[in-house]
């Protein structure tokens, strides 16, 4: 019986797989050959592999030497209808140097752990897909809600525009009233200026009248002083006249006393006789007449001036009273107009403040609405981006799931093909490994290996290649051709 061995090396630090089988036993002999193996995986960095050993014949296989991998025994082909005597060569009982890897049990345990890890990852991917589907439904619900909400929020802008237009019309009315009040204020100010000019003229006339009154008073004082001087002069003249009269009487008495003692006969002309009494009386009469006329003239002039001054004072007092009444009336009118102007200004200020506040509130509301709209648009855009990311992740998860499904199917087909070859007999197997990017086409098996290496059948075993030798008596098994695409970058083709 011929034995074949296979070895697959990897440069990336991963283990390869090996299989050892015996096909077509010769009568009376049993041969089991095995080679150390290393597992191979479709994922980089994932160590481990699998090994199988079966015996085609009417007996079950047994272990020789150290155990390795996992054992499987089976019968290939139909069993004979009856049990025949089996003769065993005793030389086969001697221990064989099979060069079995002592770490096969650890490798098997690692393979089981890796399969468990892959199953856990697959379950995690399925849970993630379900979670992403739920998130997708939630995002679709939010999207519909935001669309309906956008339609409802679009009615706010016309409402604010109408409110702002009403406030603008009110502001225009207030501006018109302000213009009218300003015109009235200008008219009142002009009237006030006219009254002010008249008041100033009246004040000037009053000052002129007072000056005239002072001048007339000075004239009256001068006339009174002149009258006093004249009275003093008249009194002085009267005293002087009395003194002269007394002096004349005394001289006359002395003369009479001297004459009484002498008697003289003198012839005198009576026409030359000086009558002092008449002269004095005449002079006195003249002075009295002059004084009385001066007094009468001064009194009449004083009375006339006093009457004129009284009339002027009464007239100016009446004019001043009327002017004061007009000034008081103008002051009351000015105060009333000033109060009305202040009230109008306060009302205008309040209306302007209300308009400004309304505009600010409207602008704030519009800004808030725009901000909310921008936030909603940003949230919508973010939701779209999240949905796109989730869809991308979902697609990646589905691609990973497809790759895992393909890998599982490939492992299953590989195991089934291996069992079938062990049962039916193994012929020549050509294994071709090629590297590719983006897709894998295989005839029933997919592995990962180093890029740029090819594995071909032949009699030699080199690093990074597989050499499979089978006897001519075993017909080659033809695996079913299948083709699929996954995200692996390397392929193994069996032909």
From Swiss-Prot:
Keyword annotations from UniProtKB, A to Z: Coiled coil, Intermediate filament, Keratin
Matching SUPFAM superfamilies: Intermediate filament protein, coiled coil region
Region Linker 12: start-end pairs: 258-274
Transmembrane segments: none
One Pfam family recorded for the sequence: Keratin_2_head
Annotated region described as Linker 1, given as residue ranges: 147-156
Domain annotation IF rod: ranges: 111-422
Complex formation: Heterotetramer of two type I and two type II keratins.
Family assignment from sequence similarity: Belongs to the intermediate filament family.
Protein name stated in the entry: Keratin, type II cuticular 87
């Amino acid at each position: 019986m011929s034995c074949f061995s296979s070895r697959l090396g990897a440069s990336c630090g991963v283990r390869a797989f090996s299989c050892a089988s015996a096909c077509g036993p010769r009568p009376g002999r049993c041969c089991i050959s095995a080679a150390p193996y290393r597992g191979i995986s479709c994922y980089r960095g994932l160590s481990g592999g699998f090994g199988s050993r079966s015996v085609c014949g009417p007996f079950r296989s047994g272990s020789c030497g150290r155990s390795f991998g996992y054992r499987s025994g089976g019968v290939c082909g139909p069993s004979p209808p009856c049990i025949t005597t089996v003769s065993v060569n005793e030389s086969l009982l001697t221990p064989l140097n099979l060069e079995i890897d002592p770490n096969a049990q650890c490798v098997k345990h690692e393979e089981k752990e890796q399969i468990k890890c892959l199953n856990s990852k697959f379950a995690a991917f399925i849970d993630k897909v379900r979670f992403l589907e739920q998130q997708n439904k939630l995002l679709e619900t939010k999207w519909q809600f935001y669309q309906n909400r956008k339609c409802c929020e679009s009615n706010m802008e016309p409402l604010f525009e109408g409110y702002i237009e009403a406030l603008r019309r009110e502001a225009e009315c207030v501006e018109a009233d302000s213009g009218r009040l300003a015109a009235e204020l200008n008219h009142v100010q002009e009237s006030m200026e006219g009254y002010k000019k008249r008041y100033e003229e009246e004040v000037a006339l009053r000052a002129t009248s007072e000056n005239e009154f002072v001048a007339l008073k000075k004239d009256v004082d001068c006339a009174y002083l002149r009258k006093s001087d004249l009275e003093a002069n008249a009194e002085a003249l009267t005293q002087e006249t009395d003194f002269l009269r007394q002096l004349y009487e005394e001289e006359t008495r002395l003369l009479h006393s001297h004459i009484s003692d002498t008697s003289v006969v003198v012839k005198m002309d009576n026409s030359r006789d000086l009558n002092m009494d008449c002269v004095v009386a005449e002079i006195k009469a003249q002075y009295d007449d002059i004084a009385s006329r001066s007094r009468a003239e001064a009194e009449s002039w004083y009375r006339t001036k006093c009457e004129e001054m009284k009339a002027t004072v009464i007239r100016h007092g009446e004019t001043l009273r009327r002017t004061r009444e007009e000034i008081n009336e103008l002051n009351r009118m000015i105060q009333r107009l000033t109060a009305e102007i202040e009230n109008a200004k306060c009302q205008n200020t309040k209306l302007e403040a209300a308009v400004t506040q309304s505009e600010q509130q409207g602008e704030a509301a519009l800004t808030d609405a725009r901000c909310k709209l921008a936030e909603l648009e940003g949230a919508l855009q973010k939701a779209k981006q999240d949905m796109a990311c989730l869809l991308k992740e979902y697609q990646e998860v589905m691609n990973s799931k497809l790759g895992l499904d393909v890998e599982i199917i490939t492992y299953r087909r590989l195991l089934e093909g291996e069992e079938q070859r062990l049962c039916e007999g193994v012929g020549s197997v050509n294994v071709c490994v090629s590297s590719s990017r983006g897709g894998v086409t295989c005839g029933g098996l997919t592995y990962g290996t180093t890029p740029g290496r090819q594995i071909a059948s032949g009699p030699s075993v080199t690093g990074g290649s597989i050499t499979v030798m089978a006897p001519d008596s075993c017909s080659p098994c033809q695996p079913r051709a299948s083709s699929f695409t996954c995200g692996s970058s390397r392929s193994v083709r069996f032909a």
